[in-house]
From Swiss-Prot:
Sorted UniProt keywords: Disease variant, Intellectual disability, Nucleus, Phosphoprotein, Transcription, Transcription regulation
Assembly information from the UniProt record: Component of the TFIID basal transcription factor complex, composed of TATA-box-binding protein TBP, and a number of TBP-associated factors (TAFs), including TAF1, TAF2, TAF3, TAF4, TAF5, TAF6, TAF7, TAF8, TAF9, TAF10, TAF11, TAF12 and TAF13. Interacts with TAF2C1. Component of the TFTC-HAT complex.
Protein name: Transcription initiation factor TFIID subunit 2
InterPro entries in UniProt: Aminopeptidase_N-like_N_sf (IPR042097), ARM-type_fold (IPR016024), Peptidase_M4/M1_CTD_sf (IPR027268), TAF2 (IPR037813)
PTM-bearing positions, type Phosphoserine: 1185, 1188, 1194, 1196, 1198
Gene name per UniProt: TAF2
Gene Ontology BP terms: G2/M transition of mitotic cell cycle; mRNA transcription by RNA polymerase II; positive regulation of DNA-templated transcription; positive regulation of transcription initiation by RNA polymerase II; regulation of DNA repair; regulation of transcription by RNA polymerase II; RNA polymerase II preinitiation complex assembly; transcription initiation at RNA polymerase II promoter
Purpose: The TFIID basal transcription factor complex plays a major role in the initiation of RNA polymerase II (Pol II)-dependent transcription. TFIID recognizes and binds promoters with or without a TATA box via its subunit TBP, a TATA-box-binding protein, and promotes assembly of the pre-initiation complex (PIC). The TFIID complex consists of TBP and TBP-associated factors (TAFs), including TAF1, TAF2, TAF3, TAF4, TAF5, TAF6, TAF7, TAF8, TAF9, TAF10, TAF11, TAF12 and TAF13. TAF2 forms a promoter DNA binding subcomplex of TFIID, together with TAF7 and TAF1.
Family: Belongs to the TAF2 family.
Source organism of the structure: Homo sapiens
GO terms assigned for molecular function: chromatin binding; RNA polymerase II general transcription initiation factor activity; transcription cis-regulatory region binding
Composition bias type Polar residues, residue spans: 1093-1102, 1182-1199
Biased composition (Basic residues): 1144-1171
């Protein structure tokens, strides 16, 4: 092999890429995707892709690409037929016959399977052999064009078809299809390099029915009709280098709206929704203006498209130059509650256009930078649009969320470093999944990861200032946009990738500040800080003695050393102090500025410069302190528990102007049920200039305090007189005024107060009759005729209020509840709910909010024993065809019923829906709800916990969810919640089995198979070079399928070694090719001259959970159909793994000669495998993963 070609390539790469070292031996520069047939009836897609690649090493003879679900018909490189192999170990993670049921084992195997096809490790499911005729061409590093014909039949992930079963043509029915998925999932719908770090330009062509519209990335160059005018082809060009993971598609009979403010923006929605689309998107141009202004940089693409579709995978999915939204975000001008939520979704998607789509990431460990920046600039937009109060409330909410999650699960690591120096190889050993790859992450963990990323960006901004922060973003964007315009210097494109080190370097260049300690604290390690604070005032020294303790031993916590701000409000004003938190300092002395109370009355200055009169009678006469706050700016990711007197919390609630401080004091006052607390809360409710969310929280706190003070409470029920004064008629206080929701603050308060009032209880722990009558009157006299806004959310809250008023039934002699002996109050509630439900059928409300509330209320009545507990109603509402919010509410009730009544039948019904429901989001939600409200947990004895359930869930996560990463990770979460990490307790002890130890090359007798053996297997996989004599027997998840040419003698020796040790053929039930085996054990026999024939096995098995029948003849039928009849010539072996193909040979009835040769395990191969043999290229070849036949309880080993 001449080395001359290699060196220049390597030098080039180093010089141009500035730190980005591609894991692939080639550079992709352009890709064509052409889908020329989409059949909505059959839910199938036919097309081809063409990838233009430049080899970067001379001896490139294998090209690995990503492809899942696609049936590959034919591969050509520069118009020469190329042989290929398809191997996807993620289809079935653990061997179907393995009796392993512990999650530790599964997580290791799953992480290995994912990295075996991870493009960022240079791997892929599809391995293409470069024809020998092109080897000289490759050595000269000349361009290769790879042409792949493929089809997709009823895809279960990646592309989602929505085909309503009504009359009419597909366009009239509103049938549409769109791409979807979690992280990099483009491989599910066309072959590509599915990595965020491999950028190229794109040409996208889609041929669809004339009534349909295809929306994709980039500029629509032209639309061409066929001669008969029945079909048309949309041609899109994306000239900005983009990763395949950011390519998307939506096809449907869309109505089109060009944005009236920005003509380069186009909006698409399903038929008849155009008026809603106009209103919903009318605001978008302001978001554009805001981002362009703060980033001082134009929007990077030449156009932007928003597509609103049904049955969305997530509410917002951002792709290069287009975003796909759920159609449920559309709303009219009459809707109040949805408006801010939809605007937030639009703003989020646009932030991700800059950071996430235009600027991509180098590797998974740099993901936090993109998620952090897009979340941070979205926060800035929120501050400008909804105001500082809303922004600070959001930051506090996000902080509470991440703190609660980290304390519960043990920490979220933003920048995982693997296998490097001091860092442990498993930085997240407390988790039940690997964090080395996005596809193994729990969905909840990933949401929290995004939340933490933007909070950390805010901490960086606190450290270097917002001005510098925005300069850094501008620098990243400018470099990227310069790079993106270099059409012929693709090595420059790596400037469009962001890495953690590059980002930090930018920060230090721009700001000159060293933020390394901050990064070390929050990015390179997981955990949050837990502070406990208390104080004493030393009158003699006029000093505040503050004691701050930390808990850094609990899971999810870390030790904090550094500055901490404390704000003290004294009589003479508000003072900030910065304490230095050291290793062991607990006590801090803070000098006070004011002497204790003066006699002369004077106004007290607040933090914001305002001066107010205060009634100081409640305070301690010896102390000038009004209230104290620790870390008021939330500049540490922390939880603070601070002790101060009740009057201090009351002053803080009344007079502190920061909404976060007010929220904190409301939370603290729950512990002080006194008349003074009651008064402070009532004052806040009456204050119109107080932030509406604080007033809403005060309602619920007041209800709790009233319940604690029930024996001493005087006057009408809490909040009733206030509500009457604010919202009822003067002349008739029990009749509510005609609705007028012009003031949104009072609208939210009017909606919330009755819900909080319904939580009031009298001395007998029942809801006071007066309150229930009051709520029923609100419903009865509700009048929305003169209101310009819809009252559907308000009415839904009234039903929630009715549900809140329900208390447990008192049963006499176990009487059965019937409608005749219902408690009269409950009868009234039930009548209202029934009336509302019937009204909904005639006049449905927006998003069916009322039906949702009714279903929840019925479940409350069931749980409290007023109506018979029966899931039938909920099951009927949960069926496919109802609006998604109704389905989720109904399913929530069924999940709850399953837990309370321990119903195996309902659990099975739910599991069946997880497998078979047409909507991916619903399947995901059911798993999520079962995890949050499980029928039992790992430490409980439960009749539901049995071997059949373990097997069922194991199969679900092992092979039943391979089409959707999110679903699989959800199944793993559920399995963990129910059974924990080790072997489920309800299983019998496994029989004695043999464990094959690949490291020692010997079998070990082992009663319970311990995860250590897994570690052994993994090392064997990751370091194949350490066992030259075991080349053929490699772990199916091997991540380093080495590229060097194979010495065939070694292969034959290893085959002899393995066949001698593992007598696989003698074993009748080798599961290598049962229908449920993943493609890792399927042979793809691809004859060279079979242009266009369907020669690859379909990689789309119909997963079902009734996997009782193991490999019977019928099961193999689909596989055999896919083999080619011409494949009876001797088969050449071409990768290390394929050498062990004989394990599954007895499943193929085509290659008899090959089988005869091996029948007695004599490896006397007559033909030579020479590097330049032309014969070799004419022969078909086979592939099968050697270890595919390996059960963890292996057959006997005999030497």
């Amino acid at each position: 092999m001449p080395l001359t070609g290699v060196e220049p390539a390597r030098m080039n790469r180093k010089k141009g890429d500035k730190g980005f070292e591609s894991p692939r031996p080639y550079k992709l520069t352009h890709q064509v995707v052409c889908i020329n047939n989409i059949n909505f009836q059959r839910k199938s897609v036919v097309g081809f892709v063409e990838l233009t690649i430049f080899p970067t090493v001379a001896n490139l003879n294998r090209i690995k690409l990503n492809s899942k679900q696609c049936r590959i018909y034919r591969v050509r490189i520069n118009d020469l037929e190329a042989a290929f192999i398809y191997n996807d170990p993620t289809l079935e993670v653990c061997h179907s016959e393995s009796k392993q049921r512990n999650l530790n084992y599964f997580s290791n195997a799953y992480a290995a399977a994912v990295s075996a096809v991870d493009p960022d490790a240079g791997n892929g499911e599809l391995c293409i052999k470069v024809p020998s005729e092109l080897w000289k061409h490759v050595d000269e590093l000349k361009v290769l064009k790879i042409h792949i014909n493929f089809s997709l039949d009823q895809p279960k992930g990646g592309l989602h078809f929505v085909v309503p079963s009504v009359e009419g043509s597909m366009a009239e029915r509103g049938a549409h299809v769109f791409s979807c998925g979690y992280q990099n999932s483009t491989r599910f719908w066309f072959p590509c390099v599915d990595s965020y770090s491999e950028l190229c330009t794109w040409k996208l062509e889609f041929t669809v029915d004339a009534a349909m519209v295809a929306v994709s990335n980039g500029d629509l160059v032209e639309t061409v009709y066929t001669h008969d005018m029945r079909k048309k082809t949309f041609h899109y060009m994306l000239t900005i280098p983009t990763a395949a993971s950011n390519i998307s598609l939506a096809i449907g009979p869309f109505e089109i709206l060009v944005d009236p403010y920005m003509h380069e923006v186009t909006h698409f929605c399903l038929p008849q929704l155009l008026p809603l689309l106009k209103h919903t998107t009318s605001y978008l141009h302001e978001v554009f203006e805001f981002y362009e202004e703060i980033l001082t940089c134009r929007y990077p693409y030449s156009c932007f498209k928003t597509v609103f579709i049904d049955e969305a995978y997530v509410e917002v999915a951002a792709y290069a130059s287009m975003s796909i939204f759920s159609t449920n975000l559309l709303h009219s001008a009459m809707i109040i509650d949805e408006t801010p939520l939809t605007r937030r979704c639009l703003a989020q998607s646009l932030a991700q256009q800059f950071f996430g789509c235009f600027i991509s990431r180098m590797s998974w460990s740099d993901e936090w930078v993109l998620k952090g920046i897009s979340g941070y600039i979205y926060g800035l937009w929120m501050k400008k649009t909804f105001g500082v109060n809303e922004y600070r409330h959001w930051i506090k909410e996000e902080l509470d969320k991440i703190v609660a999650y980290e304390l519960k699960t043990g920490g979220v690591l933003l920048h995982p470093i693997f296998g490097g120096g001091k860092e442990k190889d498993n930085p997240a050993s407390h988790l039940h999944f690997s964090i080395k790859h996005p596809h193994t992450l729990s969905w909840e963990y990933y949401s929290m990861f995004q939340c933490k990323a933007h909070l950390v960006m805010r901490l960086i901004e606190n450290r270097i200032s917002m001005e510098f922060m925005l300069q850094v973003f501008n620098k990243l964007l400018s470099l990227a946009s310069t790079a993106s315009s270099q059409k012929f210097q693709s090595h420059m494109w790596s400037q469009m990738l962001v890495s953690t080190s590059g980002f930090l370097k930018s920060i230090s260049n721009v700001s000159g500040k060293d933020i390394q300690p901050l990064i070390k604290q929050w990015v390179d390690q997981s955990g949050v800080v837990k502070f406990y604070g208390s104080f004493a005032f030393n009158r003699k020294r006029n000093v505040l003695e503050l004691e701050i303790k930390q808990d850094y031993t609990s899971p999810g916590t870390q030790k904090y050393v550094g500055p901490l701000k404390v704000t003290v409000q004294e009589l003479d004003g508000s003072f900030n102090h910065t304490l230095q938190i050291e290793e062991n300092s607990l006590k801090h002395d803070i000098p006070c500025h004011s002497k204790s109370r003066r006699n002369k009355k004077k106004k007290i200055p607040l933090m914001n410069g305002e001066e107010v009169d205060m009634d100081l009678s409640a305070m301690d006469a010896d102390s000038p302190l009004l209230w104290i706050r620790i870390d008021p700016d939330m500049s540490v990711l922390r939880k603070v528990e601070f002790e101060q007197a009740d009057f201090m919390w009351q002053y803080q609630l009344r007079y502190e102007r920061d909404v976060v401080a007010q929220q904190e004091s409301i939370l603290a006052l729950e512990k002080f049920p006194t008349p003074a607390s009651r008064l402070a809360l009532t004052d806040i409710l009456e204050q119109e200039q107080c932030f509406y969310r604080v007033r809403m929280s005060a309602c619920f706190c007041l209800a709790k305090i009233a319940n604690s003070m029930v024996s001493t409470w005087t006057g009408p029920p809490a909040m009733k007189s206030l509500f009457t004064r604010m919202f009822c008629c003067k002349s008739c206080p029990n009749i509510v005024k005609t609705n007028n929701f012009m003031s949104f603050q009072s609208y939210f308060l009017q909606k919330t107060m009755p819900v909080a009032m319904a939580l009031l209880r009298d001395v007998h722990n029942l809801c006071p009759k007066e309150v229930l009558t009051f709520i029923l009157d609100l419903i009865k006299y509700n009048d929305n005729r003169k209101n310009k806004f819809s009252d559907n959310y308000y009415r839904a809250e009234m039903i929630d209020a009715l549900a809140n008023s329900v208390t447990p039934a008192v049963s006499v002699n176990n009487e059965v509840r019937t409608l005749d002996n219902l408690n009269p109050d409950v009868r009234l509630i039930l009548e209202e709910i029934t009336r509302f439900l019937n009204m909904e059928k005639l006049l449905p409300s927006y998003r069916h909010t009322i039906t949702v509330s009714c279903l929840r209320a019925i479940r409350v009545l069931q749980k409290n024993g007023h109506v018979p507990s029966d899931p039938a109603l909920f099951k009927s509402y949960a069926e496919y065809g109802h609006f998604v919010d109704i389905r989720i509410a109904a399913l929530e009730a069924v999940v709850d019923y399953t837990k309370v009544d321990r119903s195996y039948e309902e659990l099975q019904w739910l599991l069946n829906m997880i497998q078979n429901d047409p909507v991916p989001y619903v399947r995901h939600k059911i798993l999520n709800m079962l995890t949050k409200n499980p029928p039992f947990t790992k430490n409980m004895e439960s009749p539901l916990c049995n071997e059949a359930l373990v097997d069922q869930l194991w199969k679900l996560m092992n092979s039943g969810t391979s089409h959707d990463w999110r679903l699989r990770c959800g199944a793993v979460d559920l399995y963990f919640t129910l059974f924990g990490l080790s072997r489920p307790s309800c299983l019998p002890l496994p029989e004695l089995g043999l464990v094959l130890n690949l490291k020692e090359k010997k079998a070990v007798l082992n009663p319970t198979i311990i995860p250590e053996s897994v570690a052994g297997n993994q090392e064997a996989a990751n370091n194949p070079s350490s066992h030259p004599q075991l080349v053929g027997f490699q772990n199916p998840f091997s991540s380093s399928q080495d590229e060097e040419e194979i010495d065939m003698d070694t292969v034959h020796d290893s085959q002899a070694f393995i066949s001698h040790h593992l007598n696989m053929l003698e074993r009748p039930s080798t599961p290598g090719l049962s229908k449920y085996r993943p493609a890792s054990s399927r042979s793809a026999l691809i004859p060279q001259h079979s242009a266009g024939c369907d020669s690859t096995p379909t990689t789309k098995p119909q997963w079902s959970l009734e996997l009782a029948r193991k490999g019977t003849g019928k099961e193999q039928a689909p596989l055999e159909m896919s083999m080619h009849p011409a494949a009876s010539a001797p088969l050449s072996v071409f990768t290390k793994e394929s050498t062990a193909s004989k394990h599954s040979d007895h499943h193929h009835h085509h290659h008899h000669e090959h089988k005869k040769k091996k029948k007695k395990h004599k490896h006397k191969h007559k033909h030579k495998h020479k590097h330049d043999s032309k014969e070799k290229d004419k022969e078909p070849f086979t592939f099968s993963s050697p270890a595919s036949g390996r059960s963890i309880r292996s057959p006997s080993l005999s030497d």
